[in-house]
Amino acid sequence: MRGVRRRRLQRGQETLQAVLVVAFMLLPVLFGIVELGGLIHVWIGQQSAAAIGARVAGERGEDDAIVRDRVAVELHAAGLDPAHVQVTVSPPYVRWGQPITVRVISRRHLAIPFLFSRDLTLASSYVGRGEVNH
């Protein structure tokens, strides 16, 4: 009788240990995967916006409102708020064949339960070539 009771208690302890392992080890991994997926989504959206911005800036040969608007439209299409993203275009004017760089920077907060929390800076840049002669 005591042996049967002891085995039942031991099975209960094993079940509790399994639940704790899942809760404290596998859940942070799951949350980490979800957080990393969100960061990759943001980065891909920024890459797309920088590429479009470099293309439009190269076509126009300068940094102007049309370039900024096109980058904002692309960021919005990716689900990002253009107000929270820094866009730089350098140099402001280019001639035929000269490089023009569009850089998109945003700050994100990464938090994985039970592990860590930190602020990250995501940066994307693309280089286009001037297609007009000023």
Name every feature range the model reports, one short phrase each.
Residues 2-71:
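Alpha-helical assembly-interface signal, strongest on the long, hydrophobic N-terminal helix that forms
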Residues 55-134:
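Short, conserved structural patches
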